[in-house]
């Protein structure tokens, strides 16, 4: 999901996840309504991960406890996901002393441990350096390859191309275009989407507003 600031990307994710209820309409997942069962089949990672005042391993363990997993299962899952996310050597470290990039990897590991059907990622690399961004993207790819559907918001068009199978372009709370990734970036159909991809959205909007004002000035009814 891409779009400029204020497009409604984060709001859209929260509605899909069930954190917010729509004032009109409904959210449906694979034909079913957003019930408690569906919510429990989902996980979400925010731009700024929330860490418990516990060790790295305990942060993952706590999430698994809430899902009712046995102690034996929890230990096995924790070892596996921390290893896949490159955090096994840090499992006894307090989570809050990790670097921001390591905390984001831990947030992904915690979500992955739940084996969700769908994982929502709200700009997970927005504040990361290039090396940490690459590491997080590799984890995201691994989670997707393991069978989890991923819905991700990003301002990084390169990241959208690297990770996305399908692109949704939002602007001011409206879905203006939806297309397969290659098709979207090669030939966006919507004017705003095309301007956004070219990095010209601000100038396009200013030009449109100027043309509108000029038309209003020429309208004799406005004299």
Residue ranges and their predicted role:
Residues 17:
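Helix-to-loop junction immediately C-terminal to a conserved catalytic motif
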Residues 72-90:
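Conserved ABC ATPase "signature" region
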Residues 94-98, 102:
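Conserved ABC ATPase signature
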Residues 119-122:
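Catalytic Walker B motif of ABC-type/P-loop ATPase nucleotide-binding domains
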Residues 130-132:
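Helix N-cap at the start of a conserved alpha-helix in ABC-type nucleotide-binding domains
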Residues 154-155:
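H-loop/switch region of ABC-family ATPase nucleotide-binding domains
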Residues 160-162:
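A short, surface-exposed alpha-helical micro-motif characterized by mixed small hydrophobic
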């Amino acid at each position: 999901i891409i779009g400029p600031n204020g497009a409604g990307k984060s709001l859209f994710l929260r509605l899909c996840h069930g954190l917010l209820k729509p004032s009109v309409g409904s959210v449906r997942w694979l034909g079913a309504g957003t019930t408690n069962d569906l919510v429990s089949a989902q996980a979400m990672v925010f731009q700024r991960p929330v860490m418990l005042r516990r060790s790295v391993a305990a942060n993952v363990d706590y999430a698994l406890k809430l899902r009712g997993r046995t102690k034996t299962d929890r230990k096995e899952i924790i070892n596996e996901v921390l290893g896949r996310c490159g955090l096994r050597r840090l499992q006894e470290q307090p989570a809050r002393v990790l670097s921001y990039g390591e905390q984001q990897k831990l947030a992904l590991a915690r979500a992955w441990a739940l084996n969700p059907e769908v994982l929502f990622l709200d700009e997970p690399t927005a504040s990361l350096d290039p090396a940490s961004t690459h590491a997080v993207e590799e984890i995201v790819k691994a989670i997707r390859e393991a069978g989890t559907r991923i819905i991700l918001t990003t301002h990084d068009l390169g990241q959208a191309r690297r990770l996305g199978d399908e692109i949704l372009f939002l602007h001011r709370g409206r879905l203006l275009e939806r297309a397969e990734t290659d098709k979207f970036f090669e030939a966006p159909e919507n004017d705003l989407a095309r301007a956004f991809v070219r990095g010209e959205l601000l100038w396009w909007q200013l030009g449109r507003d100027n043309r509108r004002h000029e038309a209003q000035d020429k309208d004799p009814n406005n004299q």
